[in-house]
Amino acid sequence: MERIQVIDNIRQLGLTTLPVGSSLFLYGSQARGDAHKGSDWDLLILLDKPVLTGQDYGIGYPFRCLGWDIDEEINPQVYSQKEWSDYSYTPFYKNVEQDKIVLL
């Protein structure tokens, strides 16, 4: 599947499954443009709440299912907006913030 089609599928799934106020970003090699055939798709999902609850951890599952359906590896990471901002001192946070592409 073409890159733009994968991005469109991810975006459409986000529109139909994520709670209002959520943000969805693509990061990593797919966002930087240096991905190769077989590279995974790294997603950051931020929920508009201070802390995640047990239910929130399942929010990424539909994205994994999409990946299985289209034969791509999709790896969603889910955080609350507050929890994500608390990681601002980490190299992971800095790399994601540098590379990310807004999908929603």
Give the predicted meaning of each segment:
Residues 1-25, 31-37, 47-104:
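Catalytic core of pol beta-like nucleotidyltransferases
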Residues 42-46:
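Short beta-strand->loop micro-motif that forms the acidic, two-metal-ion catalytic signature
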